[in-house]
């Protein structure tokens, strides 16, 4: 398992394109990219936002994110919760998960 971290994407995931994030070539869904705050991918439900979320889902790795101060919390609250590695998450897509506050993951 490999773990990569970034933050403050604010809905712009261009830094995750293969040309910029070259390490992703050999990754699998068992490898994680953690976005530490200000994910911005769940903001207004727009078509372009949905396209970016689908694009993230199509990556070879799993995207995890922690909410920051620039999130649409009303929209985030509309997603169902499930348990993942012992803590609660909100699956935005099967491989794009919001790591909820106050949780501990194994």
Residue ranges and their predicted role:
Residues 6, 12-105:
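Core catalytic region of metal-dependent phosphoesterases/phosphodiesterases
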Residues 1-4:
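Extreme N-terminal starter segment of soluble prokaryotic enzymes
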